[in-house]
Amino acid sequence: MAKTIYVLNGPNLNMLGTREPDTYGHANLADVEQLCAETAKNFGLAADCRQSNREGELIDFIHEAHAKNAAGIVINAGGYSHTSIALHDALVAVKIPTVEVHISNIHAREDFRHHSFTAKAAFASLSGFGIDGYRLAINGLAAKIGAVDPSNKVKS
């Protein structure tokens, strides 16, 4: 059975493809989830993709990842990245290798987006690569946990 990574998307990411396409692009959440599933599969991993507009539900997903011994977490907490100490604390509590992703470059946007609580709980943070940031995050996570791409027998 494949090790599972959780891919967690926060508020408004269900609106990808229609919400501010100049900032977030034209890909929708299903495109992101497909990209994550395919990338994870390349490393013999399974991607369990979740989205919620509610902070508490995202925390429940993090706790579930811990309870199910998930190998890692990729999280785009959306606006909660900049405000949620509770998400930070949940990620720290579970001690699961985590990568933070943002589709847009949060440092080139409004000042309030420049600080991320979730980044402080992650071993890496990617920002500004569009949805390709998810692929990069999974590659980095695979390297961190020692997953190997079976197509070329090389670690990520």
Curated annotation (Swiss-Prot):
Disulfide bonds: none
GO BP annotations listed: amino acid biosynthetic process; aromatic amino acid family biosynthetic process; chorismate biosynthetic process; quinate catabolic process
InterPro entries for this protein: DHquinase_II, DHquinase_II_CS, DHquinase_II_sf
UniProt-annotated catalytic positions: Y24, H102
Reactions performed catalytically: 3-dehydroquinate = 3-dehydroshikimate + H2O
GO molecular function, one term: 3-dehydroquinate dehydratase activity
Job description of the protein: Catalyzes a trans-dehydration via an enolate intermediate.
Family: Belongs to the type-II 3-dehydroquinase family.
Name this protein carries in UniProt: 3-dehydroquinate dehydratase
Lineage, top ranks: Bacteria, Pseudomonadati, Pseudomonadota, Alphaproteobacteria, Hyphomicrobiales
Chain's gene name: aroQ
